[in-house]
Amino acid sequence: MTDSQQSKPKHVMMMAAGTGGHVFPALAVAKQLQQQGCQVSWLATPTGMENRLLKDQNIPIYQIDIQGVRGNGVIRKLAAPFKILKATFSAMRYMKQLKVDAVAGFGGYVAGPGGLAARLLGIPVLIHEQNAVAGFTNAQLSRVAKVVCEAFPNTFPASEKVVTTGNPVRREITDILSPKWRYDEREQADKPLNILIVGGSLGAKALNERLPPALKQLEVPLNIFHQCGQQQVEATQALYADAPANLTIQVLPFIEDMAKAYSEADLIICRAGALTVTEVATAGVAAVFVPLPIAVDDHQTANAKFLADIGAAKICQQSTMTPEVLNQLFTTLMNRQLLTEMAVKARQHAQPNATQHVVDLIQKM
């Protein structure tokens, strides 16, 4: 390696598009790479949410025109090879122009052509899969990638290039105090159990409609914090209207400080997206996961099993959420010692150093 090559900062192109589940972990890694002196650029789609999320992040964006083909109509599928080829050439042009040294793909439509472009140019590729079941793009790229990162064990067949890193999470989540300390403090203060229900930014209608009737049947003192989405506040409040006196209820459109919410919760009831499961484990909170039934390849159930299989969480499929089933489940869980044990197990299986682990792997390529 020449002196000029040694003095040139490593240029890493990030590839992530479409959803926050892809973009947020990639952004955490990108910011850490920048802090270590790397030059970072981002391969994006023209209309994806990544453009909005990266607006003030001081990361230059380069767009290629690509859309998903899985499950779409015949005409789009026939046109797909030509669109992929065009997008691949566009990505190759950017990579040569920018003198990219390494490429890191985190999923989304953009990662396919980008990974292929890097492969054709001889640029090393790292991919990161956030879910317990690999997405279509990452499953294909795993064949040509130099390093394959998985958030959950056994997502990919065992290989020297496969590394279980966990999912990168925000610093405020990794800084939450230990679950044993938090739960013991609340027990010593003889506080009611805190139940946190998180339906996401749009609100999970099934959680909003089915949980209040079941929770109202419980006889123990509870503080319920129910995040239901902006459009479902009034309807959710109405379902709690005749709640008994042992329940203290707050219905919220959204929660700005999730780290605080995690730290104060004894039990969380939520979907099982990859980042949600990762944050629950990192925070150390007992959980009931209700996987999204329409998730591709039922990956949310696979995500939830990561914690359920070690006794840190329960899985309740949406199709089984009857008042009787929920009442039986919640009655079992209204035990602070059990919840403490679940929370401790969750934290024990977290990987809070995932961001730095992925960064180190990129730096070594």
From Swiss-Prot:
Please provide the record's keywords in A-Z order: Cell cycle, Cell division, Cell inner membrane, Cell membrane, Cell shape, Cell wall biogenesis/degradation, Glycosyltransferase, Membrane, Peptidoglycan synthesis, Transferase
Q: How does it sit in the membrane?
A: Peripheral membrane protein
Catalytic reactions of this protein:
di-trans,octa-cis-undecaprenyl diphospho-N-acetyl-alpha-D-muramoyl-L-alanyl-D-glutamyl-meso-2,6-diaminopimeloyl-D-alanyl-D-alanine + UDP-N-acetyl-alpha-D-glucosamine = di-trans,octa-cis-undecaprenyl diphospho-[N-acetyl-alpha-D-glucosaminyl-(1->4)]-N-acetyl-alpha-D-muramoyl-L-alanyl-D-glutamyl-meso-2,6-diaminopimeloyl-D-alanyl-D-alanine + UDP + H(+)
TM region positions: none
UniProt xrefs under Pfam families: Glyco_tran_28_C, Glyco_transf_28
Give me the residues that bind UDP-N-acetyl-alpha-D-glucosamine, please: T19, G20, G21, N131, R170, S201, I255, A274, L275, T276, V277, T278, E279, Q300
Please give the family membership noted in the entry: Belongs to the glycosyltransferase 28 family. MurG subfamily.
Q: What is this protein called?
A: UDP-N-acetylglucosamine--N-acetylmuramyl-(pentapeptide) pyrophosphoryl-undecaprenol N-acetylglucosamine transferase
Give the species.
Acinetobacter baumannii (strain ATCC 17978 / DSM 105126 / CIP 53.77 / LMG 1025 / NCDC KC755 / 5377)
